[in-house]
């Protein structure tokens, strides 16, 4: 019996230790569990689905908390569901990108990814299948990278289900995540998604990026950046072509309200798309979106509006938008652009250089600037075409002025336009507005050709007349009459600024005399001449009080110092000297002074 007792005691202790260890794994007093404690390997080969889901479910049973994911590559062969009140958290504390576009150990393979990486493989060829990760009420996905290792860089790429989606719950969050190459990234629209929160999300969605719909309480989206980094190292990538043909970065349906801040998409067919809600009742109709510092670049359609909420609509402010703005005839809501830069597209697919507007809603541009950045558009006649509805363009700038059809006729109002207000705008070129509208129209207060003909009321002056026999050399005459050495600036006269004698004046900063302006009048006959120099007024009170003027004549060299500050634009007498015939004499201005100096004109009067 004694011999049997010891083994039994040993086995009992082992069983107790195992039970205690299992209890330690299953319970956390700190609110944290780690997937490796549940058997996750993170080697990129072992299926870690069960370990992840066990950790998530155990955390939910304890009332919620954080399941951490150590650095590694975790193969998830099916999908995950993050329960209520649980956060799945990786190592990242900010959105990441690929460390290198290609892993040096596998140049033809995928990117080099570090941190907490989840490898998604389920659902190839089934875009309507189960999402890779479901979020429940008050659940969060944070600090992870998700990569599809079996995705192909083809046109089309392999279709997969959504990467992250809500189960139909409020308060779902995505923070500090990188979705490398999802076919469809985030679905907060197929099911209810009120008060969702997305911050610091990076990725290259191939077909659809972020879809929002069925949100009856304010959603918030911050710092989302979609760009083609996965294909950046592959010249002429077929995937990049697919994105420009089919890709939609942001799809916004029914939301009441939605705040969108610091978001960006580049190289998609549609950058930001507003659509009618997919459901009926309170979920019907368009959305109400406020977008700040949010835009799209290199897109066929940077903004596509199919429908917005009738009484609220959408508003862009302080945003840059590269690509066409298209408002369909299905839209009845407001679309506002305030303080935005609008640049058009290079693709010529939409029949306009910058915007095509229809529908029954009001589209307004206030304090914006329009600049068709691609000069080679050959097949478009207008910058902005308004087919129907309402348009307002106020206090804005049209930059284009070169000889192109869309520059010569920047705005077209077609007959079905109900109301148009185009006032107080500046056009660098022609301000031709073709008004065929049958509705009420106000076009007033616009100014045109401010770059091609900047001073239409100012006529270039004739050369001033002086005393009979006077010899005048102006700073605009050029050699051999005048030569400038060192650094000299030029201020030209305008219709409201006459600072110089004829066309303007040269000036130089105070210095050591290395800036020299040498005026050499052509004297027809030897004799005595009174020398004058012209000085303009002092607009900045920084002119010299001792500006030196050297007069070299047949009598030798003499220097006269002039106080420029009280002068109002006048000839200053420098003395009478004997000059030989020809260009043997000179009057020289230098910057060896206590302030800025002028060199404008010199006059010799005989007698």
Question: How should these model regions be labeled?
Answer:
Residues 456-607:
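Extracytoplasmic
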Residues 1-4:
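Positively charged n-region of N-terminal signal peptides that target proteins for export
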Residues 70, 77, 83, 89-91, ...:
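Feature marks extracellular polysaccharide-active and adherence modules
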Residues 16-26:
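Bacterial Sec-dependent signal peptides at the C-terminal "C-region" and cleavage site
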Residues 64-65, 77-79, 97-100, 124, ...:
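Short glycine/acidic-rich loop motifs that flank beta-strands on beta-rich extracellular proteins
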Residues 7-17:
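Bacterial N-terminal signal peptides
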Residues 53-61, 74-89, 93-142, 147-171, ...:
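Extracellular beta-strand-rich solenoid/capping regions of secreted or surface-exposed proteins
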Residues 35-70:
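Acidic Gly/Asp/Thr-rich repetitive segments characteristic of extracellular carbohydrate-active
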């Amino acid at each position: 019996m004694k011999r049997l007792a010891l083994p039994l005691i040993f086995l009992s202790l082992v069983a107790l230790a195992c039970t205690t260890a299992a209890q330690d794994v299953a319970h956390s007093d700190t609110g944290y569990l780690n997937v490796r404690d549940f058997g996750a390997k993170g080697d990129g080969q072992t299926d870690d689905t069960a370990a992840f889901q066990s950790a998530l479910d155990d955390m939910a049973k304890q009332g919620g908390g954080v399941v951490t994911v150590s650095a590694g590559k975790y193969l998830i062969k099916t999908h995950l569901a993050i329960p209520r009140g649980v956060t799945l958290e990786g190592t990242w504390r900010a959105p990441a990108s690929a460390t290198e576009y290609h892993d040096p150990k596998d140049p033809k393979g995928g990117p080099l990814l570090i941190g907490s990486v989840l490898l998604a493989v389920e659902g190839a060829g089934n875009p309507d299948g189960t999402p890779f990760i479901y979020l429940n009420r008050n659940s969060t996905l944070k600090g992870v990278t998700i990569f599809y290792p079996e995705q192909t860089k083809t046109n089309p790429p392999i279709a997969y289900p959504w990467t992250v989606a809500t189960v139909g719950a409020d308060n779902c969050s995505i923070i500090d995540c990188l979705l490398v190459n999802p076919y469809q990234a985030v679905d907060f629209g197929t099911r209810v998604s009120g008060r969702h929160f997305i911050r610091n999300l990076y990725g290259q969605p191939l077909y659809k990026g972020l879809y929002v719909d069925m949100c009856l309480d304010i959603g918030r989206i911050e710092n989302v950046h979609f760009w083609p980094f996965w294909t950046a190292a592959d010249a002429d990538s077929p995937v990049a072509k697919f994105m420009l043909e089919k890709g939609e970065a942001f799809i916004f349906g029914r939301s009441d309200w939605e705040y969108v801040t610091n978001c960006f998409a580049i190289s998609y067919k549609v950058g930001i798309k507003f659509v009618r809600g997919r459901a009926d009742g309170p979920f019907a109709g368009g959305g109400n979106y406020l977008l700040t510092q949010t835009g799209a670049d290199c897109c066929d359609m940077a903004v596509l509006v199919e429908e917005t909420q009738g009484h609220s609509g959408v508003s862009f402010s302080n945003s840059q938008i590269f690509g066409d703005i298209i408002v369909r005839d299905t839209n009845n809501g407001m679309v506002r652009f305030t303080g935005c830069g609008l640049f058009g597209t290079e693709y010529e697919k939409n029949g306009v250089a910058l915007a095509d507007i229809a529908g029954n809603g009001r589209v307004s541009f206030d304090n914006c600037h329009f600049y068709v950045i691609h000069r080679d558009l050959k097949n478009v006649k207008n910058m902005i075409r308004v087919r129907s509805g309402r348009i307002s363009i106020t206090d804005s700038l049209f930059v284009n002025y070169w000889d192109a059809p869309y520059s010569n006729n920047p705005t077209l109002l077609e007959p079905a336009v109900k109301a148009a207000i185009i006032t107080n705008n500046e056009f660098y070129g022609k301000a031709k507005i073709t008004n065929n509208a049958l509705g009420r129209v106000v076009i007033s207060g616009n100014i045109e050709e401010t770059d091609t003909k900047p001073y239409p009321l100012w006529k270039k002056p004739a050369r001033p007349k002086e005393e009979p026999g006077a010899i005048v050399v102006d700073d605009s005459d050029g050699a051999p009459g005048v030569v400038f050495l060192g650094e000299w600036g030029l201020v030209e006269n305008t219709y409201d600024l006459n600072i110089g004698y004829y066309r303007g004046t040269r000036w130089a900063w105070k210095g050591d005399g290395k800036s020299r302006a040498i005026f050499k009048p052509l004297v027809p006959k030897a004799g005595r001449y009174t020398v004058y120099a012209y000085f303009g007024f002092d607009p900045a009170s920084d002119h010299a009080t001792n500006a030196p003027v050297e007069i070299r004549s047949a009598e030798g060299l003499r220097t006269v110092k002039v106080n420029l500050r009280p002068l109002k634009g006048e000839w200053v007498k420098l003395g009478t000297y004997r000059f030989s015939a020809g260009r043997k004499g000179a009057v020289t201005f230098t910057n060896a002074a206590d302030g800025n100096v002028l060199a404008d004109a010199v006059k010799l009067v005989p007698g």
